[in-house]
């Protein structure tokens, strides 16, 4: 395994193929240990992981905390409503405070895009050894979700060898609210790195035409793309046509909390055109995998029948795979700092 090059993890835009492979290799090891009955190992014993979540979360927050505990790290949690934020303290000063308490890694979720870059820059300026791990920042990025999604697809398409190259030329259909989705942006970086051809499907209000050029937008302070050749992005407005040739589908939630009022004419019309149902799935002659990062809006973007009855609905697999992926990220950051 290569020496891990990142002190902080903000985005997948600056991940190389070797970076992905390092994460997946470790995740495979941790998953194998769990399957063999070993649920806890002393890999991060004596380290402190601090969970700073300024937005609501079920899957990501609890998955990161469980991942840290399985590595034997101490876990420190944070409640915004009972913190000094209510007295006017800034998020950056809050992060510096937890770093001063000895946090080795800050796992941060916040509604502001690029906030983890700002926090990391401040910490580095005071020579802090604390790493920052982005657990979702505004509309920008959700690296661990992008990693666990691609890991779930790799395990589906290549269960014996777990070879990421299996995604090369696969047609991955992403349906729904791409414009407000940090998950979608991370998926675009991750899937394209392994040569997947990505189809974005939804109305123009949720998938503007400029997303066709998304992969030409680097991360802050990034001068070049570490991936030499990426897959493609196309945009479709017809779910029925797109579904016919798809090898996998990722459904996205309508993020009404981030939308401008009246962005969509109606939820019912959106569901009629772009909701994933058994009838629409029947247009594809393969039993393709279905993913959704959660939380689900049942019978809006995805039918309950698909969630509960479709044999290759991998939503629970995604949740399970999130733990070894996040274990790998926490472990790699600590090894970088030693």
Swiss-Prot record:
Keywords: Pyrimidine biosynthesis, Transferase. It holds the Pfam family OTCace. The keyword Transit peptide does not apply. Its EC number is 2.1.3.2. GO terms for molecular function: amino acid binding; aspartate carbamoyltransferase activity. Pathway: Pyrimidine metabolism; UMP biosynthesis via de novo pathway; (S)-dihydroorotate from bicarbonate: step 2/3. GO terms for cellular component: cytosol. It is an enzyme of class 2 (transferase). L-aspartate binds at residues 87, 182, 253. Carbamoyl phosphate binds at residues 59-60, 109, 142, 145, 294-295. It catalyses: carbamoyl phosphate + L-aspartate = N-carbamoyl-L-aspartate + phosphate + H(+). Gene3D superfamilies: Aspartate/ornithine carbamoyltransferase. GO terms for biological process: 'de novo' pyrimidine nucleobase biosynthetic process; 'de novo' UMP biosynthetic process; amino acid metabolic process. InterPro entries: Asp/Orn_carbamoyltranf_P-bd (IPR006132), Asp/Orn_carbamoylTrfase (IPR006130), Asp/Orn_carbamoylTrfase_sf (IPR036901), Asp_carbamoyltransf (IPR002082), Asp_carbamoyltransf_Asp/Orn-bd (IPR006131). SUPFAM superfamilies: Aspartate/ornithine carbamoyltransferase. Heterododecamer (2C3:3R2) of six catalytic PyrB chains organized as two trimers (C3), and six regulatory PyrI chains organized as three dimers (R2). Catalyzes the condensation of carbamoyl phosphate and aspartate to form carbamoyl aspartate and inorganic phosphate, the committed step in the de novo pyrimidine nucleotide biosynthesis pathway. Belongs to the aspartate/ornithine carbamoyltransferase superfamily. ATCase family. This is Aspartate carbamoyltransferase catalytic subunit. It comes from Prochlorococcus marinus (strain AS9601). The lineage of its organism: Bacteria, Bacillati, Cyanobacteriota, Cyanophyceae, Synechococcales. The gene is pyrB.
């Amino acid at each position: 395994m290569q020496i891990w090059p990142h002190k902080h993890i903000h985005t997948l835009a600056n991940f190389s193929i070797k970076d992905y492979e390092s994460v997946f290799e470790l995740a495979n090891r941790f998953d194998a240990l769990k399957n063999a009955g070993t649920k806890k190992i002393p890999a991060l014993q004596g380290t402190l992981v601090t969970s700073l979540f300024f937005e609501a979360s079920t899957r990501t927050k609890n998955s990161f905390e469980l991942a840290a505990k399985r590595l034997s790290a101490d876990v420190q949690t944070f409640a915004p409503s009972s913190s000094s934020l209510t007295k006017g303290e800034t998020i950056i000063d809050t992060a510096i405070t937890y770093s001063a308490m000895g946090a080795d890694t800050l796992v941060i979720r916040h509604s502001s895009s690029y906030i983890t870059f700002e926090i990391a820059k401040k910490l580095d300026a005071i020579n802090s050894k604390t790493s920052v791990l982005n657990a979702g920042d505004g509309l920008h990025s959700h690296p661990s979700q992008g990693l666990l999604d691609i890991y779930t697809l790799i395990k589906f398409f290549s269960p014996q060898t777990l070879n990421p190259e299996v995604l090369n030329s696969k047609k991955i259909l992403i349906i729904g609210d791409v414009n407000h989705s940090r998950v979608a942006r991370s998926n675009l970086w991750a899937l394209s790195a392994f040569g997947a051809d990505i189809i974005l499907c939804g109305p123009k209000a949720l998938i503007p035409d400029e997303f066709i050029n998304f992969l030409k937008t680097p991360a802050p302070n990034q001068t070049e793309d570490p991936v030499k050749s990426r897959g493609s992005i196309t945009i479709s407005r017809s779910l029925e046509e797109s579904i016919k040739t798809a090898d996998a589908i990722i459904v996205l939630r309508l993020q009404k909390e981030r939308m401008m009022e009246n962005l969509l004419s109606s939820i019912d019309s959106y569901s009629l055109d772009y909701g994933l149902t058994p009838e629409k799935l029947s247009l594809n002659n393969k039993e393709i995998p279905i993913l959704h990062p959660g939380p689900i809006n049942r019978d809006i973007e995805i039918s309950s029948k698909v969630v509960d009855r479709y044999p290759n609905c991998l939503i629970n697999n995604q949740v399970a795979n999130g733990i070894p992926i996040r274990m790998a990220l926490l472990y790699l950051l600590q090894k970088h700092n030693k």
